[in-house]
């Protein structure tokens, strides 16, 4: 056996082990959603869908899911606006403290979630904010802005300045240049940044614990049910459905974008 072939096989085995490490627990949870018993034991004693209806019609789960979707959507919207605006400002203009501002923009995602959560909680209490949807959105936006900013600023750095200059030389105004040149170039970065921001917000637990007050988002509801050992079959169903739904935006993003990283406008 040649060294090249041995290396290829070794790398293949290593990749298979890594993928198994990442996805086998997810597959097991998905199988537990069809477990006829309310006790999580392996192997499962058959397949059933009897837990799906109770899980879907659970009012506490529905309320938590709706709150998570609203918070994630609003946090993503805030992140897209602020993150893209910040990336344009940092990339296009030269000013004193530019690198420091860039560092401060990406710092929140590097901080431990418990630090961010405690800081936000103290701030909200000091200013007598009512804990609820908007405090959750503010908390999630602190790290969602980072992923949008990183994606967009990285794409802007790879975008040749000559494209914008050529557009202006051909008589296009600022809006036309943005619409036909800049936006198609950064569209995939916005899509990927928005999807990642939504995913991070949707499954956030630590920061949400400090900013949600008495309300439960879906991850907090799941954590509470697992910690108390209640409704585990329904929790497994909810986890399975969430995993299934998350495939949709990823597939749409792949369909709407192209390998070149440029979104077609025609």
Report each predicted region and the residues it spans.
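Transmembrane-helix boundary motif in ABC transporter permease subunits
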Residues: 1-8, 73-105, 118, 122, ...
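C-terminal transmembrane helix and the adjacent membrane-cytosol boundary/short C-terminal tail
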Residues: 2-14, 153-164, 168, 174-183, ...
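Interhelical loop and adjacent transmembrane-helix boundary motif
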Residues: 3-7, 37, 52-60, 208-259
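Transmembrane alpha-helices
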Residues: 13-14, 19-26, 117, 149-152, ...
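Short membrane-interfacial helix/loop motifs at transmembrane-helix boundaries
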Residues: 24-59, 211-213, 266
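Non-cytoplasmic
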Residues: 29-40, 148, 189-223
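Membrane-interfacial helix termini and adjacent extracytoplasmic/periplasmic loops
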Residues: 39-44, 49, 98, 114-143, ...
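Hydrophobic alpha-helical transmembrane segments of multipass integral membrane proteins
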Residues: 62, 66, 70-82, 86, ...
